[in-house]
Regions:
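A carbohydrate-recognition surface predominantly in extracellular/luminal proteins
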Residues: 26, 31-39, 50, 59-65
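Aromatic- and Gly/Pro-enriched, solvent-exposed loop/edge beta-strand patches characteristic
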Residues: 9-32, 82-174, 178
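Short beta-strands within extracellular/lumenal beta-sheet-rich domains
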Residues: 35-55, 120-123
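Short consensus segments that form the blades of beta-propeller domains
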Residues: 74-84
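Compositionally biased low-complexity segments at domain edges in trafficked proteins
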Residues: 170-207
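A broad structural signal for short, well-ordered beta-strand segments within beta-sheet-rich domains
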Residues: 60-62, 106-109, 199
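Extended extracellular/luminal ectodomain segments enriched in beta-structured repeat modules
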Residues: 53-73, 134
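Sec-dependent, cleavable N-terminal signal peptides
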Residues: 1-6
C-alpha cells in the first residue's frame, strides 16, 4: 500500500481589518452618523496600515459588520436621506496605476445583504469571492449602513468613492454613487480621518 508521510497543511486564514478591540458605532448617540451611497475602504484602522490589502491569492469566505441600533427617528432620517432598507455588499478593488486622485477598478462584488434584521449586532455573512495579492476588499453601501465609528484617533482613516470636491457637502454625499458596475473605474478622492468603517473580511489562502 502506497502512502504519503507528508502531513496536510491547512490553508492560511487571515481576517482582514480585525483589531484587538472594536470601537462602538456612533448611533444611537449624538451625533448619529452612518455611511451611505458610497464604496469605501479603511486605509488605517488605528493599529494597521492598509488593513484590507490582500496579502496573498485566495478567496474571501466570510465578512462581518458591526452595526449600531439607531432610534426610530434616526432610522427614518437615514431612510429619507439615502433610501431604504439599509444594505451593504463587499467590493473587490484594484488601484489604477498612476491615477491621481486615486482611481480603483471594481473587479468583483458580493451579494447585497439587507441589514434591517441585524441592527445592534455584529453580523457575519458568508462569501466566496476570488481575490489576488494586492487587491483591496472594500465595502459598498447602496443605501445606508450604521457600521461607522467616529471621533477616533487621527490614525483612523478611510477612503471613499467620491470626487475630491464632493467630500463634505450634504447634497454631494446624498447624490454620491457607490461603485457597483464590475469593470468600472471610479475616483476615490475623499479621505476621512478620525473615523472607521466597522467591517472585516476573512481570507482563505488558495484558489
Amino acid at each position: 500500500v502506497a502512502g504519503s508521510s507528508a502531513a496536510k497543511v491547512s490553508p492560511t486564514t487571515v481576517v482582514l481589518g480585525q483589531t484587538a478591540t472594536v470601537p462602538d458605532p456612533s448611533c444611537p448617540g449624538m451625533p448619529c452618523q452612518a455611511i451611505g451611497s458610497v464604496t469605501g475602504f479603511q486605509v488605517n484602522n488605528g493599529q494597521t496600515s492598509l488593513p484590507f490589502v490582500v496579502p496573498h491569492d485566495g478567496r474571501i469566505k466570510a465578512w462581518t459588520l458591526t452595526l449600531a441600533q439607531p432610534t426610530n427617528s434616526q432610522r427614518a432620517f437615514f431612510n429619507g436621506f439615502f433610501g431604504t432598507p439599509p444594505q451593504a455588499r463587499l467590493a473587490i478593488l484594484r488601484r489604477v496605476a498612476g491615477a491621481n486622485p486615486p482611481r480603483y477598478t471594481l473587479r468583483r462584488q458580493g451579494e447585497v445583504q439587507i441589514l434591517s434584521p441585524y441592527l445592534g449586532q455584529t453580523v457575519r455573512f458568508g462569501a466566496n469571492l476570488k481575490v489576488e495579492k494586492g487587491d483591496i476588499v472594500g465595502l459598498t453601501v447602496p443605501t445606508w449602513a450604521p457600521a461607522f465609528a467616529q471621533d477616533l484617533n487621527t490614525n483612523n482613516v478611510w477612503r471613499a468613492s467620491r470626487e475630491p470636491e464632493a467630500c463634505k457637502n450634504a447634497t454631494d454625499i446624498r447624490q454620491g454613487e457607490p461603485q457597483e458596475r464590475v469593470g468600472s473605474r471610479m475616483p476615490y478622492g475623499c479621505k476621512y480621518t478620525t473615523a472607521r468603517l466597522l467591517y472585516t473580511a476573512t481570507l482563505v489562502e488558495g484558489r
